[in-house]
């Protein structure tokens, strides 16, 4: 618009020349006007460029500073699509008769009673093979160590692993002994002390010759308190998929007796 104003000023000057003498606008003045406008346009362009560069720099810095969390989720977990912090809703606290533990939030209570003294049973609503039970029975023992070693204790509560009902002659495939259709192997055991109370923690792999040679992991946590034997038994399939393992192991590891 400044250049246009300059040309209009030149035309007005020519019309007024016949009426009164006036200094004509020279080429130098017109050139200066154009140059001044060009300088202003260049200045405006530079400002716009500087602003764009600043915004780009800020956006780049923000992208570097923010750590984006992946949206992928394991089995049983909710995807954190927008990267917002969320509370841990994977487990629910449960308090029973003298005991407490964390139960996977998506597990359902079960009315099935497998063992004498069973007071609680929950199972995975996707695969019932993953489940946990709490068993409470009276005992004359003062502490869990009165049962002997963890392996000796396990031999006295063999009902937790199931009893072989078949008594005939057989030679099953899969590494079973003659006339045996089930086997149990202790994978690891420990005797942790939690809040001054002695516990036994035992992991057992059980296998049967009924097409389940792959086996199941049995996680057993036990202690004695107030004349009672408290046992938490959690089970999972040996060949499980991503994510299921943590629910069973964390639930078994959270078991404690008051």
From Swiss-Prot:
Keyword Iron: no
GO biological process, one term: photosynthesis
Any one of the GO CC terms: photosystem II oxygen evolving complex
Superkingdom, natural source: Eukaryota
Stored Gene3D superfamilies: Mog1/PsbP, alpha/beta/alpha sandwich
Keywords associated with the record: Chloroplast, Membrane, Photosynthesis, Photosystem II, Plastid, Thylakoid, Transit peptide
A Pfam family of this chain: PsbP
Job of this protein: May be involved in the regulation of photosystem II.
Name of the protein: Oxygen-evolving enhancer protein 2, chloroplastic
Source organism: Triticum aestivum
